[in-house]
Design a protein with these regions (language model features):
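Surface-exposed, low-hydrophobicity beta-strand/loop segments enriched in small/polar/acidic residues
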Residues: 2-134
Length: 134
């Protein structure tokens, strides 16, 4: 028989490794491909232009409060557009959690890799957490 020792497991902190996604609880009803902010009450839509943690992975159309969701926090992902977007635009969150071109004072969560012609289009983005637009 094998000996299974769980007590000696070591966890190494590696800031460049690990997964580009995190599993969290929805703190409100959410649509997929929207940006969320982690709060003590779960993942919620941030205030427009404010800091966001990541983007809910594409899946079911809506997520109920208390559901487990997967949130992408870096690398390339897909974010639903709130307006027309050009490739290369720096993107911030709008009041619905959709992406919009960042304006002065807004938190840049991502950069658009593909354009969007209308609200609801899915934009391929690079999640960059670039801080606030100057």
């Amino acid at each position: 028989g094998g000996t299974e020792k769980m007590a000696n497991r070591t966890y190494e902190y590696n800031p460049t490794g690990g997964s580009p996604v995190i599993n969290v609880t929805a703190g409100a009803e959410l649509k997929t491909a929207v940006a969320v902010l982690l709060t003590k009450d779960g993942a919620k839509i941030p205030e427009a232009g404010k800091e966001a943690t990541g983007i809910v992975l594409l899946g079911d159309e809506t997520v109920a409060k208390g559901d487990d969701i997967t949130v992408q926090i870096r690398n390339q992902g897909m974010w639903a557009a709130g307006a027309k977007i050009e490739a290369g635009d720096f993107l911030a969150v709008d009041a619905e959690g959709l992406c919009q071109k960042a304006t002065t004072g807004q938190y840049i969560l991502a950069m658009a890799l593909t354009p969007a012609t209308a609200k609801g289009d899915i934009v391929n983005v690079a999640i960059i957490h670039a801080g606030y637009e100057a």
